[in-house]
A protein has these predicted regions:
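Gly/Ser/Thr-rich phosphate-binding loop
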Residues: 252, 279-284, 293-352, 365
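Conserved AMP-binding A3 loop
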Residues: 52-57, 188-215
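Conserved pre-ATP/AMP-binding loop-to-beta segment of ANL
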Residues: 38-40, 171-192, 199, 224-230
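Structural core segment of the AMP-binding/adenylate-forming
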Residues: 72, 96-168, 278, 484
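Conserved AMP-binding/adenylation subdomain of ANL enzymes
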Residues: 211-233, 238-280, 295
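Conserved AMP-binding/adenylate-forming core of the ANL superfamily
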Residues: 42-96, 113-118, 167-168
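AMP-binding/adenylate-forming catalytic core of the ANL superfamily
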Residues: 115-119, 127-132, 282, 388-390, ...
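Conserved structural elements of the adenylate-forming
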Residues: 63-65, 171, 203-224, 289-293
């Protein structure tokens, strides 16, 4: 654990990784807290508001039982177990069962369609999947195309042909199971990337990935954990940000996690949930924060101690709104599926600079480099790289040695994100390499323009892309969701264009403005710029 301090440089100097040779996430996140005291592990809130508390003692018993179910089905160490569920008790339970048995779990977004599901299950060779009725409706149409998939466990509802009932199978199994003695470097989970280019790639992570996340989680959540902490995120528990920024670090530290299955994010319902369950630590993706600001949320019962966000730069306007609404700073972090939480913020360690991702996490050596792994001078644009080895980094891309090789250069993992580091050590995200807009000889990153647009009083959300231009190579186009009380018009579009011209530069203003009711998003709340580019 990090020692609480206000001296960032000393915190980094004194940090030492302590990765034990033998390590299993089930033991670390469950068994060591299952002491008979009944301390809560998961607080699940159903759609109707009813809640169920599950203790670490119960979670240990349940996960041992389901590990026996997996073993009885003939699965062995290294086999893959897929989880196609939204936030629920069954999700961490099944992960822990797979970890116990030395198997590899595969989280799958509940919103995945048939094609996305088929690719990931076929590519991973999953032998068992745990899902619910809505997941089974999608799965049964492709089941015949998945010869390696032997077992489908159904949560809730009546088991139908081709499925097995999850809870009856678990309850009938023995609670005695000897957790496999795994090495810290043994495979534990495959998390598929969002597939911005080509098919998604499966990042194979080891048990040590949890330990690699802890320094940033502890820093960003203001030296987490502290007495009374309770953690929640609206993000799907299939994303590395929800799993390893929230769920497993909380369980590792013995902190209760609130889970809630919602059809869509409701800002006012989110505030009520946090008040009802005394949530103190949240991970709120930028989209959630923007929607909360748009809804002008307030609730006297919300008493947050820490707010973490990441995935898109927030900008000064949103930072100010969070500060005035919740009375604390929002701490942004940066990472990716392959190598997460390498950079972050903590206002007690150094001042927050709007638009910056923060500084390198203790234990991480982050640099701006070229594509050969050579370090670039401070202030220069380049690829954000993380020096290796680092316990948070994936083992490899599953069954994809060529992509694995391309992910590294010299001593560094290449994030594929462009950024710069200023003289004070702050990192600034510029864009994905494939998001850069080339216009009239300039290379322009969309994030700075989007940040500027959010400062205009009419703009609730925005996304900026490049569209083909025979003269300029690309022209800048802004897709804008308006705040309540504003109506789309040519006059407003011109006003917004002039606003960016004045605030940024003449070559950075959007020559085209498209008003829209919503923006296409990934399941993790990131804007799908490629879909907007395809629309022209």
């Amino acid at each position: 654990m990090l020692t609480e301090t206000t001296d960032y440089d000393k915190l980094c100097r004194d940090f030492r990784w302590e990765i034990p040779p033998r390590f299993n996430m089930a033991t670390a996140c469950c068994d060591r807290h299952a002491d008979g005291s009944g301390r809560p592990a998961v607080i699940y809130v159903d759609e109707d508001g009813t809640s169920r508390r599950t203790s670490f003692d119960e979670l240990a018993d349940m996960s041992r039982r389901f590990a026996n179910v997996l073993k009885a089905d003939g699965l062995v160490r290294g086999d893959r177990v897929a989880l196609f569920l939204s936030q629920s008790l069954e999700l961490p339970l099944a992960h822990l069962s797979a970890f116990r048995a030395g198997m590899v779990s595969i989280p799958l977004f509940a919103l995945f369609g048939e094609d996305a599901l088929e690719f990931r299950l076929a590519n991973s060779g999953a032998k068992t999947i745990v899902t619910d009725a809505s997941g089974w409706e999608k799965l049964k149409t492709i089941r015949a195309k998945l010869p390696e998939l032997q077992n489908v466990y159904l949560v809730g509802g009546e088991a139908s042909a081709g499925t097995k009932p999850f809870w009856p199978a678990l309850e009938a199994a023995s609670p005695d199971f000897a957790t496999v003695d795994t090495a810290a470097d043994d495979p534990a989970m495959i998390i598929y990337t969002s597939g911005t280019t080509g098919n998604p790639k499966g990042a194979l992570h080891a048990h040590r990935v949890l330990l690699g996340h802890l320094p940033n989680v502890e820093m960003i959540h203001d030296f987490f954990p502290k007495a009374g902490d309770v953690m929640w995120t609206p993000a799907d528990w299939a994303w590395i940000g929800a799993l390893f920024d929230v769920l497993f670090p909380a369980l590792y530290h013995g902190v209760p996690v609130v889970g809630h299955r919602a059809k869509k994010f409701d800002p006012h319902a989110a505030m009520q949930l946090m008040a009802d369950h005394a949530v103190r630590n949240v991970f709120l993706p930028p989209t959630a924060l923007k929607l909360m600001r748009q809804a002008e949320v307030k609730h006297p019962g919300v008493k947050l101690r820490s707010i973490f966000s990441g995935g898109e730069a927030l900008g000064a306007e949103l930072l100010d709104w969070v500060r005035s609404t919740f009375g604390i700073e929002v701490h942004e972090g940066y990472g990716q599926t392959e190598c997460n939480l390498a950079v972050g913020n903590n206002a007690k360690l150094f001042p927050i600079r709007p638009g910056s991702m923060g500084k390198a996490t203790p234990g991480f050596d982050v640099r701006v480099i070229d594509d050969k792994g050579n370090e670039l001078p401070r202030g220069e644009r380049g690829i954000i790289g993380v020096r290796q080895p680092n316990p948070v980094t994936m083992i490899e891309y599953w069954k994809n040695p060529e992509a694995t090789q391309k992910k590294f250069a010299g001593e560094f993992l290449l994030t594929g994100d462009l950024g710069r580091q200023d003289e004070d050590g702050y990192f600034w995200y510029l864009s994905r390499e494939d998001d850069v807009i080339t216009t009239a000889g300039y290379r322009v990153g969309p994030s700075e323009i989007e940040d500027c647009l959010l400062k205009h009083p009419a703009v609730a959300m925005s996304a900026v892309v490049g569209i083909p231009d025979p003269v300029r190579t690309e022209s800048i186009k802004a897709w804008i969701v308006l705040r309540p009380g504003f109506a789309a018009s040519e006059a407003l579009a011109r006003e917004i264009q002039d606003f960016v011209k004045v605030k940024l530069a003449a070559h950075e203003y959007p020559r085209f403005v498209q008003f829209t009711d919503s923006l296409p998003m990934t399941a993790t709340g990131k804007v799908l710029r490629r879909e907007l580019r395809a629309l022209g």
